[in-house]
UniProtKB/Swiss-Prot annotation:
Functional note: Component of the CUL4-RBX1-CDD (COP10-DDB1a-DET1) E3 ubiquitin-protein ligase complex which mediates the ubiquitination and subsequent proteasomal degradation of target proteins. Participates in the CDD complex to light-mediated control of development. May repress photomorphogenesis through enhancing COP1 E3 ubiquitin-protein ligase activity. Acts together with the CUL4-DDB1-COP1-SPA E3 ubiquitin-protein ligase complexes in the repression of photomorphogenesis and flowering time.
Gene: CUL4
Subunit: Interacts with COP10, CSN3, CSN4, CSN5, CSN8, DDB1A, DDB1B, DDB2, DET1 and RBX1.
Involved pathway(s): Protein modification; protein ubiquitination
Organism: Arabidopsis thaliana
Protein name, UniProt field: Cullin-4
Length: 792
């Protein structure tokens, strides 16, 4: 584009103006105050341009070998004399009269006599000629007069609150519409005057300030509005239908005016607190806990929805907190005392989940955790301490633990603190009766691992073992469990009564993982003995002694047991039939020839046999203990024998013989008849072979009463455990003192508690220390009896 001529440049400069704001395009007015539109590049008062003296084309310069230096240019400066336009007579008064008429028409909801474009231009013209400040004040005055009158019209109205609120809403909506219309006309005022004067409010803010001012001057209107809003909200809480749109509009009015917090929120929260305080007391008395918790959950949902629909979001947190405080915090203890035990007993997982969720909202989970701990301990104590139900104790504990696990997972969301509470409480309750739970858990496992559990699959048995292992973890006296478990395992292995060898080994593997190899060393040794015994028996059958010396018609299998692995069995004398004595002697000869230097001792009380018997109604096989077999074989030579005759012939210890005869003559399978009849065997009783015995099965198991655990046997097992504990305590004391040489009583007791894995009382430890002093392993410091010295 070529440079403009001097004339065109001058024209552009003369068209410039001091105003920095542009106005909408419009036609030229009659008073000639409107200027032509400005050119965007001619706003400067001084326009400079230059001309080159040698206008040689650029192409010619490029063709030269050496470029010439730039030639100096001549600069022309043109100064402009701007003519200031003059205002027509009464311009300001006429323009304001026009605008005032329009503003009043807007407030009176009448038709405006002028088109909006001309009104906009009128405001623009006033601003252009520095009359914007006065115009702002005039508009503010008009607005104030109207707003004051509008709000005063609401004073003294004795209408229904809902009608009154509708009128307030109408007043507010009219105000908003009117202020927006006025702002659209006076937009130039907002864009220029307000921006240039930071202390001046926009027209909208000015209107809000006036509305707020005159609302405060009409306190009756504000107070009735707040009262009406609170009344409507309370009605809605009481399940009455209300106009939520009206509520929303009026609350937005309070927010827009900046009086929401002071005028509405404060009384609203106070009223909410009073409402729910009364409701909480009423419902707590009338409802059970599940219903009450559902009600609280519903109320919290309602209030949250209320905040979404019409209450300002800023109120949500204090509102929900108020509801939680009045419906939950105030009633935590009552809820727990009144309903927690019922919910736990009924396994009400959904209601417990609701309780946990609600309690977490008010930081009351610690109270819930304590209630859970108390419940577990009290309920478990009833199970453990009821001696009449010892038979069902373990199964009851398993069922109780299973239900707690379900509640923990489904209701308490696997909360770690709650899980630890259940574990700690279970450990407490299961050790309330010293040693007995450990013994019963071992017995329970014996029942499950014993052959005869029909309908139990390998998977089900494995699941039971896992669950029992959980109880085992809680036991403090694991040595008691080991003693009884080992005794029962021995019977299962020796009598061939294990339901599954794989299950037996699986359980030992679990115990090994739980307690270490030292705990299961003897149990594993028992299995090794059984496996080795099978090999020894096979080798014996192939030996020359067996082929040439064994009596015919008898098959015999021997378990060779390592004394250190197996329980201690008291020796019991018995006169065996000649055939069995021969068999034992031949086997002993074979074994000692193979394993020289060893010693065999027969435990006849553990033997069992299968006898073939001829009855008048058919042949039968009788599965009996060795003692029962010895007694029955006497009747091959006599039809009737007295108690004394049998005792002399067998040499069985008196109590054991009475139990044996009782099982043969007084039990379900009566292969002997006792005279006189009765449940107990007395001196002088006579026994004869029951030739008329009949049974549907060919092989019959005669319950061996003497093989059932007696009170004496239980006591003996427990005493052995206590004796072993004393040895362990003595060894621990000597081990510690040998390392420390000198130690105080308090520190010694502390270290013993750390090292010993079974429960022990300080008084018992003191007795063991005294015993070691008597045996000269330790001595007291002469100057201080509380100090012990180790004696090498």
């Amino acid at each position: 584009m070529s440079l403009p001529t001097k004339r065109s440049t001058f024209s552009a400069a003369s068209a410039s103006d001091d105003s920095s704001y542009s106005s909408p395009p419009m036609k030229k007015a009659k008073n000639d105050l409107h200027h032509s539109p400005q050119h965007p590049n001619t706003a400067d008062k001084v326009v400079g341009f230059h001309m080159e003296e040698d206008p040689t084309p650029a192409a010619a310069n490029l063709s030269r070998k050496k470029a010439t230096l730039p030639q100096p240019t001549k600069k022309f400066v043109i100064k402009l004399n701007k003519a200031k336009p003059t205002l027509p007579t009464n311009f300001e008064e006429n323009t304001w009269e026009k605008l005032q008429s329009a503003i009043r028409a807007i407030f009176l909801k009448k038709k405006i006599s002028f088109d909006l474009e001309s009104l906009y231009q009128a405001v623009d013209n006033l601003c252009l000629h520095k009359l914007d400040g006065k115009l702002y004040d005039q508009i503010e005055k008009e607005c104030e007069e109207h707003i004051s009158a509008a709000l005063q019209s609401l004073v003294g109205q004795n209408t229904d609150l809902t009608v009154f609120l509708s009128r307030v809403e109408k007043c507010w909506q009219d105000f908003c519409d009117q202020m927006l219309m006025i702002r659209s006309i006076a937009l130039t005022l907002d864009r220029k005057y307000v921006i240039q004067n930071p202390n001046v409010r926009s027209l909208w803010e000015m209107g809000l300030q006036l509305f707020r001012k005159h609302l405060s001057l009409a306190p009756e209107v504000e107070q009735r509005t707040v009262k009406g809003l609170l009344s409507m909200i309370e009605k809605e809480r009481l399940a009455e239908a209300v106009n939520r749109t009206l509520l929303s509009h009026l609350l937005k009015m309070f927010t827009a005016l900046g009086i929401y917090m002071e005028s509405f929120e404060k009384p609203f929260l106070e009223g909410t607190s009073e409402f729910y305080a009364a409701e909480g007391m009423k419902y707590m008395q009338q409802s059970d806990v599940p219903e009450y918790l559902k009600h609280v959950e519903g109320r919290l949902h309602e209030e949250n929805e209320r905040c979404i629909l019409y209450i300002d979001a800023v109120t949500r947190k204090p509102l929900i907190t108020t509801v939680e405080r009045q419906l939950l915090e105030r009633h935590i203890l009552v809820v727990l005392e009144k309903g927690f035990t019922t919910l736990m007993d009924g396994r009400r997982t959904e209601d417990l989940q609701r309780m946990q969720t609600l309690f977490s909202r008010v930081n009351a989970l610690e109270s819930l955790r304590q209630a859970l701990s108390s419940y577990v301990r009290k309920t478990g104590q009833k199970i453990v301490m009821d001696e009449e139900k010892d038979k069902d104790m373990v199964q009851s504990l398993l069922d109780f633990k299973a239900s707690l696990d379900i509640i923990w997972e489904e209701s308490f969301y696997k909360n770690e603190s709650f899980g630890n509470t259940i574990k700690d409480s279970f450990e407490h309750l299961i050790n309330l009766r010293q040693n007995r739970p450990a013994e019963l858990i071992a017995k329970f496992l014996d029942e499950k691992l014993r052959a005869g559990n029909k309908g139990t699959s390998e998977e089900e048995l494995e699941s039971v073992l896992e669950k029992v292992l959980v109880l085992f973890r809680f036991i403090q006296g694991k040595d008691v469990f080991e003693a009884f478990y080992k005794k029962d395992l021995a019977k299962r292995l020796l009598l061939g009564k294990s339901a599954s060898i794989d299950a037996e080994k699986s359980m030992i593997s679990k115990l090994k993982t739980e307690c270490g190899s030292q705990f299961t060393n003897k149990l594993e040794g028992m299995f090794k003995d059984i496996e080795l015994s099978k090999e020894i028996n096979e080798s014996f059958k192939q030996s020359s002694q067996a082929r040439t010396k064994l009596p015919s018609g008898i098959e015999m299998s021997v378990h060779v047991l390592t004394t250190g692995y197996w329980p201690t069995y008291p020796p019991m004398d018995v006169k065996l039939p000649h055939e069995l004595n021969v068999y034992q002697d031949i086997f002993k000869e074979f074994y000692l020839s193979k394993y020289s230097g060893r010693r065999l001792m027969w435990q006849n009380s553990l033997g069992h046999c299968v006898l073939k018997a001829d009855f008048s109604k058919g042949k039968k096989e009788l599965a009996v203990s060795l003692f029962q077999a010895v007694v029955l074989m006497l009747f091959n030579d006599a039809m009737k024998l007295s108690f004394e005759d049998i005792k002399d012939s067998t040499s069985i210890e008196d109590k054991e013989l009475r139990r044996t005869l009782q099982s043969l003559a007084c039990g379900k399978v009566r292969v002997l008849q006792k005279n006189p009849k009765g449940r107990d065997v007395e001196d002088g009783d006579e026994f004869e072979f029951n030739d008329e015995f009949a049974a549907p099965l060919y092989r019959i198991k005669v319950n061996a009463i003497q093989m059932k655990e007696t009170v004496e046997e239980n006591t003996s097992t427990t005493e052995r455990v206590f004796q072993d504990r004393q040895y362990q305590i003595d060894a621990a004391i000597v081990r510690i003192m040998k390392t420390r040489k000198v130690l105080s009583h308090t520190l010694l007791i502390t270290e013993l508690f750390q090292q010993l894995k079974f429960p022990i009382k300080p008084a018992d430890l003191k007795k063991r220390i005294e015993s070691l002093i008597d045996r000269e392993y330790l001595e007291r410091e002469k100057s201080n009896p509380q100090i012990y010295n180790y004696l090498a």
